[in-house]
Structure formats: C-alpha cells, structure tokens
C-alpha cells in the first residue's frame, strides 16, 4: 500500500489491480465519448471513472461531487448533457456523465492545453485540481493528490487498453 497526503490527511491508496473490469454496459459509452470529443481515449475515460468512483454512480464525495465521473454541481450545470437521450441530464446516470466528462475535458484542453507539459496530464490535473490551479502553477500543480490521480488514471488506462 502507498500512503499519500491528501488535504492534510493520510489516505491509504491501494496499488492498481487488474481485478476491476469496466462494466460491459459502459464500454459503448466510453468509446462513443472518445470518438465524439477526440481527446481522451475510451480506456482513459474508463480509467477516470475507475479512479473517481470505482464505477459507482451513487457516489457523492465530501466536496459534493456526484456520480461515476464525480461532477461538482456547478460544473455539471455548465457541461452536463443528456447523453442517453432520455430527456434528463443526470450526473448519476453514467450514460450522461461519461460524454459530459469528455465534453468538459475538451473544454479543459482549450483552457490549459497550451501550457508546457503533456496535454493529457494537464487536462487530468485540471479535472482533479481545477483549471485555475493548473494555470497558476504553469503546468501540473505540485499536489500529491493530483500527481497520484494522474498516475492512477494512466495505470488503469494501460490496464483497460485491450478491454475498452
């Protein structure tokens, strides 16, 4: 186990394991979102969902982030879409949250993508820490939580590459 300092509290982070498959019903949504928004791959989007919520759409964080992709209400209000066409854009509905996350990350790429560094790492950092933190740092901020987030997403994306 690896201990990371998060918000002044020690958080125990289990090493990435290959026993967390992508739920089969979500694979088409990850693929469609990757095709539509053209930034993160389907495996990277699935990895984000794994890191954010372990694919649990009912998760609500202490900060109030909701659903499989952990949207804050204000971010959802701006970027949330009705991905499944049922007439309701709901951050708890993975079929809405997945394309909404890809849409938001396309926006983040426009905001932070010109900073020095890997564009995907910058977008993941902005998703995790907020675009203002990335802009202020001039790149990926030196936050243990954010660096750990990027590493975990990359690890899971590699694990999911053949699956998604």
Residue locations for each model-derived region?
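Sec-dependent N-terminal signal peptides
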Residues: 1-2
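Alpha-helical segment that forms one wall of the substrate-binding/catalytic cleft
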Residues: 25-32, 36, 68, 73-136, ...
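Export/targeting segments at the very N-terminus of extracytoplasmic proteins
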Residues: 5-57, 110-113, 163-164
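Flexible, surface-exposed loop regions and adjacent strand-edge segments
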Residues: 64-66
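Conserved short-loop catalytic and cofactor-binding motifs
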Residues: 18, 89, 141
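Short, polar/charged, Gly/Pro-enriched helix-capping and turn/loop motifs at alpha-helix termini
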Residues: 62, 115, 141, 160-163
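Secretory-pathway/luminal and periplasmic proteins that interact with or process carbohydrate-rich
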Residues: 53-62, 130-140
């Amino acid at each position: 186990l690896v201990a990371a300092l998060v918000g002044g509290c020690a958080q125990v982070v289990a090493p990435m394991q290959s026993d967390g498959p992508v739920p089969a019903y979500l694979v088409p949504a990850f693929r469609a979102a990757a095709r539509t928004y053209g930034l993160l791959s389907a495996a990277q989007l699935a990895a984000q969902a794994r890191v954010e919520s372990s694919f649990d759409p009912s998760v609500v964080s202490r900060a109030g982030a909701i659903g499989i992709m952990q949207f804050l209400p204000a971010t959802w209000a701006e970027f949330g879409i009705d991905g499944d066409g049922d007439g309701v854009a709901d951050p708890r509905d993975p079929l809405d949250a997945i394309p909404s996350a890809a849409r938001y990350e396309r926006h983040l790429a426009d905001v932070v993508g010109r900073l020095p560094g890997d564009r995907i790492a910058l977008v993941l950092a902005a998703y995790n820490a907020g675009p203002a933190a990335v802009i202020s740092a001039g790149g990926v901020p030196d936050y243990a939580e954010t660096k750990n987030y990027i590493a975990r997403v990359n690890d899971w994306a590699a694990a999911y590459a053949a699956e998604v």
